[in-house]
Design a protein with these regions (language model features):
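Glycine-rich, low-complexity segments
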Residues: 1-2, 7-46, 161-164
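A detector of low-complexity, intrinsically disordered, Ser/Thr/Gly/Pro/Ala-rich segments
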Residues: 18, 40, 53-55, 148, ...
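Solvent-exposed, conformationally flexible loop/turn segments
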Residues: 35-46, 51, 56, 115-120
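Terminal beta-strand-rich extracellular "head" domains
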Residues: 57-64, 70-71, 80-135, 140-156, ...
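Mid-length scaffold segments of soluble, non-membrane domains
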Residues: 76-78
Length: 164
C-alpha cells in the first residue's frame, strides 16, 4: 500500500505477512561499560563501548566510537545524548557537543555549570540533522575543573533515522 505520493507504507509478501517500511532504521543506543576520564579544558570523544542495540551495525563501539550512516540510508536523523561529568567545583562547566565528520557542530551544544563543589553536572541535548551516506557522528565532552574528571557510565548516546 502507498500514500498519495506513491511512497510505500507497507506491503505483503504474498503469504499474508505484512511488511512495514523501516522508517526509524537505523537506530542505536550506546553507553559506557565503565567510567571514562577526560582532561581539563579539552574536547574529548566519549568512547561509548557498549551497545544496547544497533540495528544496522552502524555504530563502531570498539575503534572509532561513532555512528556512520549506512549506504542508501541518508536522511533526517535525531540524536539524543547525556553525559554525567563528576565532581566539578562550584561554577565550573561541563559540556557536550556532537561532531559531524570530525568537525564540531556548533548548534545543539549543551553546557551545565556546577552549583556546588563536588557536584555532578548533567549535560544533555537533542539534535536533528540531515545526513548523507558515510557521514559520521560522534559525541564529545568538555570540562574546565582544572584537572582530569570522570564521565560516568550512566552517560548515553542514541540516534535514529526519522525520515528521508
Amino acid at each position: 500500500y502507498q500514500d498519495a505520493n506513491g511512497n510505500a507504507l507497507f506491503s505483503s509478501d504474498g503469504s499474508g505477512n505484512v511488511q512495514t517500511q523501516k522508517l526509524n532504521y537505523p537506530s542505536f543506543r550506546v553507553r559506557l561499560s565503565s567510567n571514562q576520564s577526560i582532561s581539563h579544558d579539552t574536547w574529548t570523544k566519549i568512547q561509548f563501548n557498549t551497545e544496547d542495540w544497533d540495528t544496522n551495525t552502524a555504530y563502531d563501539n570498539s575503534t572509532n566510537y561513532r555512528f556512520t550512516v549506512p549506504t542508501g540510508l541518508g536522511g533526517k536523523y535525531l540524536f539524543c545524548y547525556t553525559a554525567v561529568i563528576g565532581d566539578l567545583n562550584d561554577g565550573k562547566r561541563g559540556a557536550v557537543r556532537l561532531y559531524l565528520n570530525g568537525n564540531a557542530v556548533n548548534y545543539g551544544r549543551e553546557n551545565s555549570y556546577s552549583s556546588s563543589t563536588g557536584a555532578n553536572t548533567y549535560s544533555n541535548g537533542q539534535l536533528m540533522m540531515d545526513l548523507s551516506a558515510s557521514d559520521y557522528v560522534e559525541l564529545y565532552a568538555y570540562q574546565n575543573n582544572g584537572d582530569s574528571q570522570t564521565i560516568y557510565s550512566t552517560s548515553i548516546f542514541t540516534g535514529m533515522r526519522i525520515g528521508s
